[in-house]
From Swiss-Prot:
SUPFAM superfamilies: FomD-like. This is Probable ribonuclease FAU-1. It comes from Saccharolobus islandicus (strain Y.G.57.14 / Yellowstone #1) (Sulfolobus islandicus). Pfam families: DUF402 (PF04167). PANTHER family: PTHR39159, UPF0374 PROTEIN YGAC. The gene is fau-1.
Length: 424
């Protein structure tokens, strides 16, 4: 076995199937997941945790220690991968300007453990602690605290028998969720090691890898297919779960259930546009009014009219923006690009075409979301201009080779279409 993995969240069924097939031992399953796979709940400590990102369930986090990185690339081939350059629970020292590397540090402690990696550009610290997969130990008021996942009173009393002697010596102990699944002897030995490491300041090897994966629509559709092999699953299950949790569960009780009504309900008269960059950061583009839509069991197509206001020039096209200019753009669940056709507000003449290359767009309530693949194409006075190919190469640190190659393949396909006058 490659390691013990705990999986939580809306992707749990599909990921349990996938990581089991990759020779990982699945532990601490929910009763529902155990029943689906006709197995007993495996109550063993986890080396790695995979779960929904609490601020956006369109992303997952992976944390722990183990050789999982290559498997993550293979499972999520068309998604963005961010690996923290600083390990979770590692001990770092901030400089005088309250930074570490290129990241701001809060609070501005001279030394502390990383309790939030810098996925938003900021490291959050707490006072220095010795950390294992079972517990944290540090000098303080001599108190014991528990993970929110340890809520059974009997279990808390069991753990207190071990931590109370250390509390009396002035050590704080925080029990992590894995502690529920270890023997008293294992925990006792672990606490002893933590105290020694804390007093000897042996923090060099402390910390856990942390990955934040922004899921693409193609990878979610793959997870739909995997889940479908285990339990009844409609197409777009994982997309719809982000907006309609209970409704999807109800729909799937009917083996002939169709996702069409739920997909249609996601489309409002005006749609926002969430343009996600390779580092996971979202840019909100000017949204647009829906002027045409088509939804069926296989997918969806939405055409927007976006009003373009302000000064400046049209990116890539180079023509000045004038009052009343507008953009007609189609978002198609089957296409890895969107064609923006910019028109003059004065005489409705075509000013130019800009093609954004991205993963196929997904729908949330009143919003279109896609992963931007950096490389774009503009058509200006019959001239084809390839934009930001160097940015694609720079941002490839966040993409697996399959996604980089796909972006280049789509760009070449579009160039051929333009040259043959077959752009649709």
């Amino acid at each position: 076995m490659k390691g013990r993995v705990r999986i939580r969240g809306i992707y749990a069924t599909a990921l349990t199937s996938i990581f089991s097939s990759l020779s990982y031992e699945i532990v601490q399953q929910s009763v529902e997941i155990a029943e689906r796979f006709m197995r007993e709940v495996n109550n063993l400590p986890a080396d790695i945790t995979i779960k929904d990102f609490e601020y956006d369930r369109g992303k997952i986090i992976v944390m722990g220690n183990g050789t999982i990185e290559e498997d993550l690339h293979d499972v999520f081939k068309y998604s963005f991968h961010w690996k923290s350059p600083i390990k979770l629970y590692s001990v770092i020292e901030a400089d005088e300007s309250c930074t570490y590397g290129n990241f701001k540090v809060e609070p501005c402690l001279e030394e502390g453990i990383v309790i939030k990696p810098p996925y938003d550009g900021k490291i959050v610290l707490s006072e220095t602690k010795a950390v294992s997969k079972y517990a944290m130990v540090w000098r303080g008021k001599g108190v014991t605290t528990f993970s929110e996942h340890i809520n059974n009173e009997e279990e808390r009393l069991r753990l207190l028998t071990l931590s109370s002697p250390l509390n009396r010596k002035g050590y704080n102990v925080k029990w992590r969720s894995n502690a529920k699944y270890a023997t008293l002897n294992e925990l006792k030995e672990d606490l002893e090691r933590l105290v020694l490491r804390y007093e000897n300041r042996e923090f060099r090897d402390q910390g856990e890898d942390f990955y934040l994966i922004t899921l693409s629509l193609p990878d979610k559709l793959h997870l739909d297919e995997v889940r479908k092999s285990i339990v009844n699953t409609v197409k777009y299950h994982h997309l719809l779960k982000l907006s309609y949790n209970r409704e999807v569960d109800s729909l799937e009780k009917d083996k002939e259930g169709s996702p069409v009504k739920l997909l249609e309900a996601l489309i409002s008269d005006f749609m926002k546009i969430e343009h996600i960059k390779a580092d996971g950061k979202a840019i909100y583009l000017r949204g647009g009014k829906v002027i045409e839509k088509e939804v069926n069991n296989d997918g969806y197509r939405i055409t927007l009219r976006r009003e373009i206001n302000g000064n400046g020039v049209l990116d890539g096209i180079g023509k000045r923006i004038e009052n009343g200019d507008y953009d007609i753009v189609e978002y198609n669940s089957d296409k890895w690009y969107q064609i923006h056709r910019y028109y003059s507000g004065i005489d409705n003449s075509l000013k130019g075409i800009y093609i954004n290359i991205s993963t196929p767009p997904e729908l949330l309530k009143g919003k279109i979301r896609y992963l931007d693949l950096e490389i774009d194409i503009a058509i200006r006075d019959s001239e084809i201009i390839v934009l930001d190919e160097d940015e694609l190469n720079k941002k490839s640190i966040y993409m697996y080779s399959s996604l980089v190659n796909k972006a280049k393949e789509v760009a070449n396909y579009l160039i051929d279409c333009i040259q043959q006058n077959k752009l649709i």
